[in-house]
A protein has these predicted regions:
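A generic structural signal for short hydrophobic patches within well-formed alpha-helices
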Residues: 13-14, 43, 118-119
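Short active-site oxyanion
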Residues: 3-4, 33-36, 67-70, 105-110
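Phosphate- and divalent-cation-binding pockets in alpha/beta enzyme and binding domains
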Residues: 25, 45, 81, 120-121
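Active-site neighborhoods of divalent-metal-dependent phosphate/nucleic-acid chemistry enzymes
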Residues: 70-120, 127-128
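Residues within alpha-helical segments
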Residues: 11-14, 63, 83, 102, ...
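Active-site-proximal, substrate-binding regions of enzyme catalytic domains
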Residues: 40-77, 81-84
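Short, well-structured N-terminal submotif of metal-dependent ribonuclease cores
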Residues: 1-38, 51-61, 126-127, 133
Length: 133
């Protein structure tokens, strides 16, 4: 299998919605990797970010972005794997993202994130990472 799926966490997805310093580099990095995935909790995370930023006009664009991402269902098996992940100080949502990304197996190109703690945990688990900037 080809490693062609880019796994996006909220810190990366928001850069596709709102222009930030890293947004152009992220878009360039994703261009040859059109298949994107994330845990289904991204739906809540991204819409909450938009609402917290006071930008309700971006909600339709956020929903459009989410429609282009394969959202991985959070079933009991995935949640159990997330609960058992090391390091023990891993935050709950980060552990869910890592378990979801790991579930992609050989198809995972990289976990795309700008969250240092999530990236460190992914590296410790042997998962490929990318932080285009």
């Amino acid at each position: 299998m080809n490693a062609d799926i880019a796994y996006l966490d909220a810190s990366a997805a928001v850069k596709l919605l709102m222009t930030e310093r890293e947004s152009p580099a992220l878009r360039r990095w994703l261009r040859p990797r059109p298949v994107r995935a994330s845990a289904s909790l991204l739906r809540v995370e991204l819409l909450r970010i938009v609402r917290r930023a006071g930008l309700p006009g971006l909600i339709p664009e956020a929903r459009k972005l989410l429609a282009g991402v394969h959202l991985i269902h959070l079933d009991d098996s995935l949640l159990d794997r997330a609960a058992d992940l090391d390091p023990t100080d891993l935050r709950s949502l980060d552990s869910i993202h890592l378990a979801a990304a790991a579930s992609l197996g050989d198809e995972l190109a990289a976990i795309v994130s700008y969250d240092d703690r999530l990236l460190a945990a992914a590296t410790s688990l042997g998962l490929p990472i990318a932080t285009p900037s």
